[in-house]
Amino acid sequence: MKNTILLLNGLWLLGLVACQPKSSSLSECPIVNVRSALQEETPISMKEDVVSIQYIPLETTDSCLISNLLNLQVTTDYMFMYNGKTEEVLQFDRKGKFIRRVGRQGNGPGEYSMISELAVDDSNKELSIFQYGGDALVYSYDGTFLRNDTTVKQAGGMYVFADGKRALKGLVMKPFEQAPWAGALQQPDGLLLKSKSLFPQGLSQDVCFMKEICFSPSTEGVLLFTACNDTVAGIYANGIEPAYVLKRENPTEYYMDIANINKFRDNTVETDQIIGVYDLFESPHYLYLRLYKGDAIFIQRFDKKTGELKSQRIPDDYLECSAAIPGGNVIGMDNDIDGGIPFWPEYVMADGGRAQVVNVDILLALREKGYLKQAPDVLNIGDEANPVVILYTFKR
């Protein structure tokens, strides 16, 4: 199933050893019994965690047509989007009104080539456009090019903490051209404070390759995960440390082979018994996981206070209505609040909420299968309309 859906731009991750704050050792990390939870279906209700939903239809004009949204950054006042098909960065306000294109593709000052991700520093009102193999380009929120950031050449993305420190996501371009770490903590002046690599012990360095990194920011920190390790790392303003242990209980050789450039594509590596992780995110009260095993995809939700773990399989209809991860999919939980689209918000908001995007093709596909009969009217958009951005606020 993992190969039938366009996979995350780069689910990438790390290995771990404690570094300080939240828990002092790996043994103190919360353990999430992923495999055993798959044996029993337990309904998961959005009402237990989500307190409000806001729908924002994006203005549609010839200047801002969105066909393939690959990244979204939601700040206090704006939304910045990377449209992969046209290689454009678009800026909208929080009501969905189009404001401007930011920068342009090219080889001159302030012009970008191949974009990997966007990042925002809401305190300083700055947008960073990360490129494969080049400096990050920094713009003000009014679209003015400010500078090249030469301190993040090895990063493919970042998250800025309130104190100005930055969590960096390692850049993966292609085999043997990658950052020496999967994640790092950096001072505002560019000095690296901590970094973390996560290859299995005993794997020769000349074959190590991390093809996927999951980099999931929240108000608490940034979660990092990689297929070759069951520990989820946390990058926080005061260090890097283990955050969770996912008991996938895959065969020992899987963890070695999935990180080996000579073996990770072999059909024998990802069998129907392997449990993989597409992506994950945190709310103040829960850890959410999107998993696959064979042809099935599951959502699991871990209660950070009680340790309760709920698991449910995603209906095949939702998979058939989806095109890609990230962006063009509704591979999520049933919306039991207002009957809207299945819930899986892939993007973080500056205020700690989460955001999801749905386009007209997905909405039409869901309706053809009999869904969205009670959905809010705002989801009735025209055939040529831009997507709708959905903002979720969580319980505190």
Please tell me what each predicted stretch does.
Residues 16-18:
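C-terminal motif of bacterial Sec signal peptides marking the signal peptidase cleavage site
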Residues 53-87:
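Beta-strand-rich domains and repeat architectures in extracellular enzymes and scaffolds
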Residues 62, 103-111, 150-157, 199-204, ...:
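Short coil/turn segments at the loop-to-beta-strand junctions that recur within blades
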Residues 68-71, 113-118, 153-162, 205-213, ...:
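Repeated scaffold domains used in trafficking and secretory/extracellular systems
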Residues 114-115, 132-179, 194-204:
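Asp-box/WD-like beta-propeller blade repeats and closely related beta-sheet repeat scaffolds
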